[in-house]
């Protein structure tokens, strides 16, 4: 069981502020896109006021598009409602230093309305609710995420000015597992690893990947909410460190026509004693609860794809032979399947291979828990494992577009029962906003094909 001692205590923060080592405190929450939104406070003001009373933020922060434009269709926040505030309450268990920003500490916030009720559609609250349901069964979810990213020698400003085209990757060829290839940018990778350690994350390893400039840094699994918070902190911190080093990196799911950036999510279940309950002497070494839990993943996978692949670009990863899944199938250590069972005994777990680097971890893990509970509560039977190439199989396919995924989500009785109508409608509208924006956009592809030749 993970140690719940925060990386930095309030008493330690008081001492660091008094000594002048900390002068800034960031309070932030994950938004719908998984980005950290919040404020930077003078440290003394934070200790005197915000620590005890929280702060406020405009509730449009959970009702805007990626460009921060106000958009229609959200029940909780609109022009008609006046775009008021919600409260941001610091979760003291998340207090930590952020070494990549001098003199700075950070906390993650929970959101509540002025009457004290939680903001139901907030990603952190959505995950909390599913973890509470899991706890009613005496279970805790242990989760690890594996984020890939591509590093470019261009700065973020240069990338913007170039419309993100023609950028120079940090490596020129496939460096999957290459020690020589990763050595090209080891100073950057080492700084990210070490400064994430300083922020309280437990780094396991780093390796190269297939797309030129593509890398992965892996962190030790932890309880679900801890992992998801750290995932968001890591993504923000890695980008900030890259910017400080004069380079850029992207976690977008599919930057080009080569391998996309994945975010495989591993999940296991433990009981009150910290014992992994997914393993026993049953078929494949899997316990009955794991078989039901995994069957629930299969049953809800298409309906919950919006949580695993939330953007238009997300679905361009799902190509045959790309190591991104296309089939709703499970297998033992089979990377062609959407769900891969790995480990044995106390390390028994499953991996969901759908999410890309653009995933909101709080929403995705909430989906995994809700799907698993559906399987457990309905006592679903697990079908036979896929033992061959799932890409060429007759299994049902994952959705191929955001539009398809959004329709499945909107009409899913499993989603409505697990998350409630408010959450289902909120994230259906998020997809609608993205689809409307994309449908109205004139793309480079259209210009190349039509400017002269049509």
Each language-model region and where it sits:
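ATP/Mg2+-dependent ligation/transfer catalytic cores
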Residues: 1-205, 247, 394-454
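Catalytic-core signal marking the mid-to-C-terminal active-site face
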Residues: 7, 20, 233, 240-241, ...
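Conserved structured core elements
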Residues: 7, 40, 124, 143, ...
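Broad gene-expression machinery/nucleic-acid interaction feature
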Residues: 24, 104-108, 144-148, 214-216, ...
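A generic structural motif
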Residues: 31-33, 112-118, 181, 221-227, ...
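Short glycine/proline-enriched loop/turn "hinge" motifs that connect secondary-structure elements
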Residues: 96-103, 141, 206-211, 258, ...
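Histidine-centered divalent-metal-coordination microenvironment in nucleic-acid enzymes
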Residues: 148-162, 208, 212-220, 252-273
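Acidic, His- and aromatic-enriched active-site or binding-groove loops in soluble protein domains
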Residues: 164-189, 224-235, 239, 273-279, ...
